Amino acid sequence: MAIHLYKTSTPSTRNGAVDSQVKSNTRNNLIYGQHRCSKGRNARGIITARHRGGGHKRLYRKIDFRRNEKYIYGRIVTIEYDPNRNAYICLIHYGDGEKRYILHPRGAIIGDTIISGTEVPIKMGNALPLSTDMPLGTAIHNIEITLGRGGQLARAAGAVAKLIAKEGKSATLKLPSGEVRLISKNCSATVGQVGNAGVNQKSLGRAGSKCWLGKRPVVRGVVMNPVDHPHGGGEGRAPIGRKKPATPWGYPALGRRSRKRNKYSDNLILRRRSK
């Protein structure tokens, strides 16, 4: 991703650094609907995820995470911006006339060809099962957890996992979070890294740009009232009045593990991610 700096004319352009993406106005049957987030509310209208709401209207892009168009070569026609994710997406035209969106592999350009199947070359953008001749140390993304369900791991911008080992019916992967876990060798993955890896270098420059993304302001608990937060209350700039920081619901805020106990996948995780 190329970072674009504007000539300084306003405070927002002075502090902003955006990616110089190419937005496409392509309209096809893969772009549909008015995709609006739930604004952090559940079905009863109660806030379950804070700091969400507003944002610009979005159209949903149907992404092919399954890559089940087997043994048919496809050509990258466009590289487009997707408002629903940080990664870019590619429009693929397959030889049988099928058109699908996939996540943009880093380094792929317009005109490149991709293919999916069991006996395909180990090439960037190709999708194949882990049980094939994929060498150890291969960088992969869009990894399936359940066979046939589609990729669920390593799909964010710049995400990449590494194939560490193969033994028996399982393959050992190191995920972007640092977690090391087992995956069935029958599951598929895409070779390469997800594009737009420099998205963390982007600076929005002003609060209004954050609102366009559907992210609302974050208020510190120490400036709230006692009824709203355990850190609230006091006269002037008072300390939190506790030994350790707490969440708005009174639980320890720093270092507390939030993963549920006795999950089915506990036996598959060889090393936990670093918190």
Curated annotation (Swiss-Prot):
Main localization (coarse): plastid
GO molecular function: rRNA binding; structural constituent of ribosome; transferase activity
InterPro entries for this protein: NA-bd_OB-fold (IPR012340), Rib_uL2_dom2 (IPR014722), Ribosomal_uL2 (IPR002171), Ribosomal_uL2_bac/org-type (IPR005880), Ribosomal_uL2_C (IPR022669), Ribosomal_uL2_CS (IPR022671), Ribosomal_uL2_dom3 (IPR014726), Ribosomal_uL2_RNA-bd_dom (IPR022666)
SMART domains the UniProt entry points to: Ribosomal_L2, Ribosomal_L2_C
PROSITE patterns: RIBOSOMAL_L2
GO cellular component labels: chloroplast; mitochondrial large ribosomal subunit
Subcellular location as annotated: Plastid, Chloroplast
Family matches, as Pfam families: Ribosomal_L2 (PF00181), Ribosomal_L2_C (PF03947)
GO terms of biological process kind: mitochondrial translation
Keywords: Chloroplast, Plastid, Ribonucleoprotein, Ribosomal protein
DNA-binding is among the record's keywords: no
Region: Disordered, residue numbers: 1-20, 225-275
Family affiliation: Belongs to the universal ribosomal protein uL2 family.
Subunit structure: Part of the 50S ribosomal subunit.
Protein name: Large ribosomal subunit protein uL2cz
Organism of derivation: Populus alba
Gene: rpl2-A
